[in-house]
Amino acid sequence: MAKKEKPEKIICQNKTARINYFIEDTYEAGIVLAGTEVKALRDGKGNLKDSYVAVKDEEIYLYGMHIGPYSHGNISNHEPERVRKLLMHKREIRRLYGKSREKGFTLIPLKVYFNNSRIKVEIGVGRGKKLYDKREDIKLKEDRRAMERGLRSRSREG
């Protein structure tokens, strides 16, 4: 009998990333965590706001991710904002390093999720949006909502 695939359980998302950046490409990476960090993430205490990814000495690190303290932890609980190492193949790291060196591109963590009981980080290669791009996106979103509202009201009448 085939093994059932479990849907990935999202722990936390960086919602501002898609607002502030055009995401060109995404990659999946593992993450090195302490035991209390894993338990805290299972409780949903992760936050990706203001976090970023950087390549240093042919290794890739996640900066600024906040993982709240584990509620049942003791004195040896983890540090909430420490630098965490990400796990990827060397060729993927080199590719990301090359893209991050290009003008305007940055590496942004998009979400943290469970994949078969392992914690993974989705990294996006993005280019920053200008203010007028953000306004254009907001206008398109409002137009789409207005159209859906109009269709809903029309279907209720008839």
Curated annotation (Swiss-Prot):
Protein's organism: Syntrophus aciditrophicus (strain SB)
Cell compartment(s), UniProt: Cytoplasm
Protein name, as recorded: SsrA-binding protein
NCBIfam families reported in the protein's UniProt record: PRK05422.1 (NF003843), smpB (TIGR00086)
Signal peptide, first to last residue: none
Entry function: Required for rescue of stalled ribosomes mediated by trans-translation. Binds to transfer-messenger RNA (tmRNA), required for stable association of tmRNA with ribosomes. tmRNA and SmpB together mimic tRNA shape, replacing the anticodon stem-loop with SmpB. tmRNA is encoded by the ssrA gene; the 2 termini fold to resemble tRNA(Ala) and it encodes a 'tag peptide', a short internal open reading frame. During trans-translation Ala-aminoacylated tmRNA acts like a tRNA, entering the A-site of stalled ribosomes, displacing the stalled mRNA.
HAMAP family per the UniProt record, alphabetical: SmpB
Gene3D superfamilies hit by this protein: 2.40.280.10
